[in-house]
Amino acid sequence: MSASFLPSILTPVVTLVFPGLMFALFFVLIEQEEIA
């Protein structure tokens, strides 16, 4: 089982999902501040 293709799949996933999670978390915190 060769894992040579893994970085090419992992890189776009990390670069898209990780900032998306950070932005979603930041958005939720702002929304909670506005509601409260």
From Swiss-Prot:
GO cellular component, one term: photosystem I
Function comment: May help in the organization of the PsaL subunit.
Native organism: Emiliania huxleyi (Coccolithophore)
Keyword Transmembrane helix applies: yes
Keyword Translocase recorded: no
Keyword terms: Chloroplast, Membrane, Photosynthesis, Photosystem I, Plastid, Thylakoid, Transmembrane, Transmembrane helix
Membrane topology: Single-pass membrane protein
Subcellular location: Plastid, Chloroplast thylakoid membrane
An individual GO BP term: photosynthesis
Family named by the database record: Belongs to the PsaI family.
Membrane-crossing residue ranges in chain numbering: 9-29
InterPro entries documented for this protein: PSI_PsaI, PSI_PsaI_sf
Name of the protein in its database record: Photosystem I reaction center subunit VIII
